[in-house]
């Protein structure tokens, strides 16, 4: 099993964000701001969906990695820590997805 995890990636992103290294994609993306980072996140989400629909496992793995990385960059820019997201997910365990959505005033989606 790989020892690399999201917390470690979050730490690397934080280090690079503060590095001032003009050769760091992370530093450049963060300095470009939320609009640029969110756009990249959206692009990676679409590419992940395309890979999933195509049932291309190799592409799905690669695009998922890109998606997670860009998601963590967006969280960094927004000042949201990964542990805050994990606490939210933890608070939802033990509840059905339908009940959780209803608690937020969202109608449940059809699975069809």
From Swiss-Prot:
It is an enzyme of class 3 (hydrolase). Pathway: Amino-acid biosynthesis; L-histidine biosynthesis; L-histidine from 5-phospho-alpha-D-ribose 1-diphosphate: step 2/9. SUPFAM superfamilies: all-alpha NTP pyrophosphatases. GO terms for cellular component: cytoplasm. The gene is hisE. It catalyses: 1-(5-phospho-beta-D-ribosyl)-ATP + H2O = 1-(5-phospho-beta-D-ribosyl)-5'-AMP + diphosphate + H(+). It comes from the Bacteria. Its main location: cytoplasm. This is Phosphoribosyl-ATP pyrophosphatase. InterPro entries: HisE, PRib-ATP_PPHydrolase-like. It is found in: Cytoplasm. CDD domains: NTP-PPase_HisIE_like. One of its GO terms (molecular function) is phosphoribosyl-ATP diphosphatase activity. Its EC number is 3.6.1.31. It comes from Chelativorans sp. (strain BNC1). Belongs to the PRA-PH family. The keyword Transcription does not apply. Keywords: Amino-acid biosynthesis, ATP-binding, Cytoplasm, Histidine biosynthesis, Hydrolase, Nucleotide-binding. GO terms for biological process: L-histidine biosynthetic process.
